[in-house]
Amino acid sequence: ADDQPVFIPPAFTEGPTPTNFGPSDPTPTSQPPQIWLDASLPDSYLEQISSGLSIQVGKSRDQAAVVVLPGEENVITRWVYALAAPFPTIPDNVSESEIRSAWQGGESTTFNGSPIFLTANTLEVFSQLWGDPAEGSVQVTAADQLQETVWDRRPAWALVPFENLEPSWKVLAVDGISPLQKDFAAEEYYLSVPISVLGNSDLVSGLDLSNRDPEQLTTVMLTGVTALVRATAWTMETNGVEYPARDIGDWLLEADILHISNEVPFVRGCPYPDPGQSGLRFCSNPKYLRLLESIGTDVVELTGDHFGDYGPEAMLNTLELYNFRDWPYYGGGKNRADAQKAVKFEHNGNKVAFIGCNAKGG
């Protein structure tokens, strides 16, 4: 029996103890940065930047990484407004103090106590900057009715975003500064609205938009009737040919396109000017062309009554003088086709054409 094999039961290896995985707290997901846009910003500014933002617009200023609002804290751009009136308005300039006084309830002497007409958004923009206006000092009007309302209430004035100006408005300077001027500086202008960015401005681009781009503006000046005859010509003989431009020459040279409506032909041997001349047959000495050269003439109108006073030869000679100086002309010419052609300019993407006629005797 001692020789019998001993049975040894197999050993069982205990398996690993299962680990109990209980629920854990979720790791918070970081929120993308947001931008907060103040509701009192100009509508047109909000419309432009909202379409191209690469960052989410938030509803809370406190949670936003970038804040955009009116104010001088960290100015990135200025939104330009114009003080406008119906085109037949006589005054050209209004003082900052008169605007401020009118806003606060004082009576405008320039516009006979008229309220300042503006849209609801413009009211919100300037209330943020100037405080709430006095009762009755402004009148809110829908944007599509503003122009008609102000025209019906003449004499009257309005605050108009620069991009909404139309030819029927006359833009008034404020303390001598107008947004139509070539040397306009928005930071010096009372009606430019500063827009500031607070926070991490590197997170978003395209906030420095403007509603006044000088690269899209064209200045056209029209002198009206120009006749270098009688007392004007006599004064030029006395004080120098360029004397009439002494005080306005620099201003005329600012124009991108300067129009001159020269009434009379240039005639060699034209009689010496008589300031008391009673007759109505006129000509100018060709040396007077120096005046038109000095002010930067770009186009000449020939519809004046007296262009034919010295006959066809004088007219044709005058056209040659213009051609020699590369001055295009219209409303008259060497033949019907020449007289009927338009003079066209293209500047900063703007197209300007001049046409004219004289219907007297027609």
Range-by-range predicted roles:
Residues 206-362:
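Acidic, metal/ion-coordinating pockets
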Residues 21-210:
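Flexible loop/hinge segments at secondary-structure junctions
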